[in-house]
From Swiss-Prot:
Catalytic activity reported: XTP + H2O = XMP + diphosphate + H(+); dITP + H2O = dIMP + diphosphate + H(+); ITP + H2O = IMP + diphosphate + H(+)
Enzyme superclass (EC): hydrolase
Pfam families: Ham1p_like
Residues annotated as catalytic: D66
Subunit: Homodimer.
Record protein name field: dITP/XTP pyrophosphatase
HAMAP family: Non_canon_purine_NTPase (MF_01405)
Binding residues for Mg(2+): E37, D66
Cellular component, GO annotation: cytoplasm; cytosol
UniProt-recorded Gene Ontology molecular function terms: dITP diphosphatase activity; ITP diphosphatase activity; metal ion binding; nucleoside triphosphate diphosphatase activity; nucleotide binding; ribonucleoside triphosphate phosphatase activity; XTP diphosphatase activity
Cofactor requirements of the protein: Mg(2+)
Record EC number: 3.6.1.66
Entry keyword set: Hydrolase, Magnesium, Metal-binding, Nucleotide metabolism, Nucleotide-binding
Organism for this UniProt entry: Aquifex aeolicus (strain VF5)
């Protein structure tokens, strides 16, 4: 089976490819980036909007991921604004010095500076849309936010997120370790199970 991954985020694409290749699913990269306005109020809505847009452009079943971090002390933030948290009014805007991930992390740590409750969770919703059919799956991983970034692997908020049962941040884990426990990995494995039981998908 072939799926078009509706993203230009290299980190997301790499993780999705690594996990789905274990199940014999071939993933394709879009030839060009589509500007899809994420107007949904939820991760699921935004994933659907992206999957539908890429399917309509390429006529290949499209897989879209919308995911993010929810921090208990400032819930529902960063939430659906996770990738652009630095630039929203809540908590004040943060200057981008090197890259957006760094600015997002800097803002998050600033907001949690005097907060004892550092519980958080990563959430992922993944949609596959094929025109006449569509399916979705979700995954999450709970953990805590560190007081400073650690590790140089992964992307996004990985350097400040320690999953439950671990003493390393996501950015300190190997790709294999991360994919085994991550929100995206869990959602993708659920999705594969649904795909293999959905005759319309083949």
């Amino acid at each position: 089976m072939k799926l078009l991954v509706a993203t230009t985020n290299e980190g997301k694409y790499r993780e999705i490819k690594e996990i789905l290749s274990e199940y014999g699913i071939e993933v394709l990269k879009p030839e060009e980036k589509l500007e899809v306005e994420e107007t949904g109020c939820t991760f699921l809505e935004n994933a659907y909007l992206k999957a539908r847009a890429y399917y309509e452009r390429y006529k290949i079943p499209a897989l879209a991921d919308d995911s993010g971090l929810i921090v208990e002390a400032i819930s529902p933030y960063p939430g659906v604004y996770s990738s652009r948290f630095y630039d929203i009014d809540f908590g004040g805007r943060e200057e981008v010095r090197t890259n957006k991930d760094e600015a997002n992390i800097r803002k998050l740590l600033r907001l949690l500076e005097n907060t004892e409750n550092r519980k958080a969770k990563f959430v992922a919703f993944i949609v596959v849309y094929g025109g006449s059919w569509g399916i979705f799956a979700e995954g999450e991983v709970r953990g805590e936010i560190t007081k400073e970034p650690r590790g140089d692997r992964g992307f996004g908020y990985d350097p400040v997120f320690v999953p439950e049962g671990y003493n390393k941040t996501m950015a300190e884990l190997s790709p294999e370790e991360k994919n085994k426990i991550s929100h995206r990995g869990r959602a993708l494995r659920k999705l594969v199970h649904v795909l293999k039981n959905c005759e319309k998908a083949f």
